[in-house]
């Protein structure tokens, strides 16, 4: 057989077999862009034209004019995005079919393969491959098959095939089936008689299975995840995703727990046309084998929507079967530290100058004590606001009508009506602001005392109370800036502010507390107009608040340091928080806040409230975090006196929580050891009770297609004999050692994270946070 140069062969074939395209072929062969030199997805490329030029290059040619041509020796066949290489290729001219044999490779921009034989119909764009290894280029997935046929534009049928998301030479897991149908347009793979293999060992079989293979929403099973823990034993989670419609979907998850039974979860999501979006979740565990065969269940419904740009609709309703639900079960409905579940609905309307809302609110209490909050059945709010003299005088009215209801007969039900008109003079320049405000707080109570079982409380309260209290506030702030002298190259700002607040004293002992708590008096709280969160208690005030903030900015105007400090001078000592007539000072505690960022790897935040009367700290918190290339380490501390807690929250049995206040220290860290291994951990200790609060350590391996994690947790769940400082010296802990395994690549419910990322998603009571408040 005569040998020809490759260029001469290409021109000869084009002339002899495809004369109409000879000129085009000559041009194409002078180009260096016949095909991409690397394997890449060409799904967005222009589709192949069945009449497009066919370019064949080979070392040898045996041609039968008008019938077929046989090419051999480094054969390449290209047509548009298609490319076939083989030891020999036979072109059947009449049928427009190419048959390639011997070390065949195939690439059409969507899939690449190596086979012993490939048959390609250039007209219908169908092909078949025998004894093939393949890889999808536009989605994750590769595998092997005895026979592959492309029967549609993006439909592949495989016989005796396998598929995995693992890279080449890695068969950590794979799905093997007698028949597989892959639809790349629909991004689904249908398996007949599939078996799931781990390291070539079968671990699961099903007669039929459909899985998504892309990132779009497709109906089908998602890959299961496996976990083993000392608390619940072996756990296997199998999710099924149902793409009901473009704006509706449903995820059904079956969770098998060796020591508990089978738990069913459902998550329905929707997006309505003009009504907003919502989500309905449900969980059900029949006959919990670990807890006396009790049926455990929970559900949650949330909806938020804005209608016609003016109406707002919001619904948030959750309920579980028992108060220990989150303590005993891992749930998407809440966390183990939740003390109550919200059950509320709200409808609101807003216009340019007024808004109104109707709200109902209830709670499911998840605590054993009797500290029940009030229900709002309902609460109606109306607000009006308008400028009177351009930008120099504003008028507004805040009002509400609330019905408070509670099942506890030791507390009264009540109707509260409140109207609060106000005038505001806002003055501002580029370097200063001055706001003066006068308000009138008028409130009416109708309290139901007939049902009270507490005679002492009944004698203190009045059935009807009308209260009118004026309020005056004037707040000024200046912004100054200069080149810093202490730190060269930095810009320093100074922001002093001062506020005068006057609220006359009013006897309010005849009003019960329905929804009011004391607000935290940190630096920013010094300049509020109210000390309480609501209006059941209006604290008297005749005081001057003053303070300042200074900030340092680098040459890119990135904030690197700020310090804020201030306090209150009580002109009338009787208006101090404690109301103690024996107070020796007219000054409040000093409030100090600071944040620091050094070169974006060392961060610090600290805050204190220091009582100058007692020469003691009331509240403090401090966090220092060091970040490096592959991880971080953080130390934190928080301190609150018991007196401060008693003044701030209402809790009948505070000794069950603390006897000396809060003094807790913790350390949190995470490190990516290398590309695959990562570790994280955290530890918290209570310095007042001298006991551990929480341990957590995690080690995780993550490959390209699977992951495995090992986690140890030890969490405090019960104080000594239910009372802090009780006779027992042995607090109760919940200890769990778990191993979880999962698949990555496609058709997974949750993507695996590194151990560092998992600090944000664990069920720990104290989660990782970054309380750094610099303006960057």
Swiss-Prot record:
Q: Which InterPro entries match?
A: LipoPS_assembly_LptD, LptD, LptD_C, OstA-like_N
Name the protein family.
Answer: Belongs to the LptD family.
For this protein, the record's NCBIfam families field holds: PRK03761.1
Stated name of the protein: LPS-assembly protein LptD
Please state the span of the N-terminal signal peptide per the UniProt entry.
Answer: 1-24
The alphabetized UniProt keywords are: Cell outer membrane, Membrane, Signal
Q: How does it assemble?
A: Component of the lipopolysaccharide transport and assembly complex. Interacts with LptE and LptA.
Q: Where in the cell is it found?
A: Cell outer membrane
């Amino acid at each position: 057989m005569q040998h020809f140069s490759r260029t001469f062969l290409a021109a000869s074939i084009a002339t002899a077999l495809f004369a109409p395209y000879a000129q085009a072929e000559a041009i194409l062969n002078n180009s260096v862009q016949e095909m991409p030199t690397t394997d890449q997805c060409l799904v967005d490329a222009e589709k192949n034209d069945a009449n497009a030029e066919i370019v064949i290059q080979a070392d040898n040619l045996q041609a039968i004019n008008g019938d077929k041509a046989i090419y051999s020796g480094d054969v390449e066949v290209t047509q548009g995005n298609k490319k076939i290489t083989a030891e020999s290729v036979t072109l059947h001219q009449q049928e427009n079919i190419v048959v390639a044999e011997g070390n065949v490779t195939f690439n059409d921009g969507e899939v690449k393969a190596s086979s012993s034989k490939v048959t390609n119909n250039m007209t219908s764009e169908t092909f078949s491959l025998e004894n093939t290894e393949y890889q999808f280029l536009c989605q994750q997935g590769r595998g092997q098959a005895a026979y592959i046929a492309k029967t549609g534009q993006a439909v592949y049928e495989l016989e005796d095939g396998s598929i995995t998301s693992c890279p080449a030479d890695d068969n950590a897991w794979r799905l093997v089936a007698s028949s597989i149908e892959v639809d790349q347009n629909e991004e689904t793979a249908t398996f007949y008689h599939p078996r799931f293999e781990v390291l070539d060992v079968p671990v699961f079989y099903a007669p039929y299975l459909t899985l998504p293979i892309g990132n779009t929403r497709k109906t089908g099973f998602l890959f299961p995840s496996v976990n083993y823990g000392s608390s619940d034993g072996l756990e296997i989670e199998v999710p099924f995703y149902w793409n009901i419609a473009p704006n509706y979907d449903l995820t059904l998850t079956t969770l098998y727990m060796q020591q508990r039974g089978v738990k069913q979860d459902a998550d329905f999501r929707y997006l309505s046309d003009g009504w907003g979006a919502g989500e309905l979740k449900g969980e059900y565990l029949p006959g919990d084998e670990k807890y006396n065969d009790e049926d455990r269940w929970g559900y949650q419904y949330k909806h938020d929507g804005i209608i016609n740009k003016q109406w707002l609709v919001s619904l948030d309703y959750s309920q579980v079967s028992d108060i220990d639900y989150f303590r005993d079960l891992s749930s998407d409905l809440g966390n183990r530290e939740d003390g109550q579940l919200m059950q509320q609905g709200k409808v609101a309307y807003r216009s340019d100058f007024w808004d109104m809302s109707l709200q109902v609110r209830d709670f499911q209490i998840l605590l054993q004590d009797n500290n029940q909050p009030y229900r709002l059945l309902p609460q109606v709010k109306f607000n009006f606001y308008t400028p009177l003299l351009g930008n120099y005088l504003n008028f507004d009215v805040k009002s509400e009508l609330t019905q408070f209801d509670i099942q506890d007969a030791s507390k009264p039900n009540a109707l509260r009506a409140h109207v609060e008109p106000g005038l505001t003079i806002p003055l501002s320049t580029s370097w200063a602001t001055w706001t003066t405000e006068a308000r009138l707080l008028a409130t009416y109570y109708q309290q139901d005392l007939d049902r009270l079982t507490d005679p002492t409380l009944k004698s203190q309260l009045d059935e009807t109370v009308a209260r009118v209290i004026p309020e005056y506030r004037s707040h000024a702030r200046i912004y100054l800036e200069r080149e810093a002298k202490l730190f060269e190259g930095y810009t320093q700002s100074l922001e002093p502010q001062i506020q005068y607040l006057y609220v006359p004293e009013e006897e309010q002992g005849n009003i019960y507390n329905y929804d009011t708590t004391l607000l935290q008096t940190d630096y920013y709280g010094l300049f509020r107009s109210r000390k309480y969160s609501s209006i059941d208690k209006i604290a008297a005030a005749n005081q001057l608040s003053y303070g300042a903030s200074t900030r340092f900015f680098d040459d890119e105007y990135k904030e690197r340091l700020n310090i804020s400090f201030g306090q209150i001078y009580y002109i009338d000592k009787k208006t101090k928080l404690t109301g103690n007539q024996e107070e020796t000072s007219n000054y409040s505690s000093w409030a100090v806040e600071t944040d620091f960022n050094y070169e974006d790897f060392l961060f610090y935040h600290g805050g204190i409230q220091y009582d100058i009367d007692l020469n003691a700290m009331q509240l403090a918190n401090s966090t220092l975090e060091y970040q490096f290339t592959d991880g971080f380490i953080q130390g934190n501390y928080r301190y609150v006196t018991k007196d401060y807690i008693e003044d701030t929250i209402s809790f009948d049995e505070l000794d069950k929580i603390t006897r000396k206040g809060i003094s807790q220290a913790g350390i949190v860290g995470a490190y990516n050891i290398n590309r695959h291994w990562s570790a994280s951990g955290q530890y918290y200790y209570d310095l007042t009770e001298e006991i551990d609060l929480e341990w957590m350590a995690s080690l995780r391996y993550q490959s390209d297609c699977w992951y495995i994690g090992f986690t140890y947790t030890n969490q405090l769940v019960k104080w000594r004999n239910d009372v802090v400082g009780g006779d027992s010296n042995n607090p109760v802990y919940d200890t769990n050692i778990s191993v979880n395994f999962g698949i990555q690549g496609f058709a997974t419910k949750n993507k695996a994270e590194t151990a560092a990322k998992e600090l944000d998603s664990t069920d720990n009571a104290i989660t990782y946070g970054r309380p750094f408040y610099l303006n960057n």
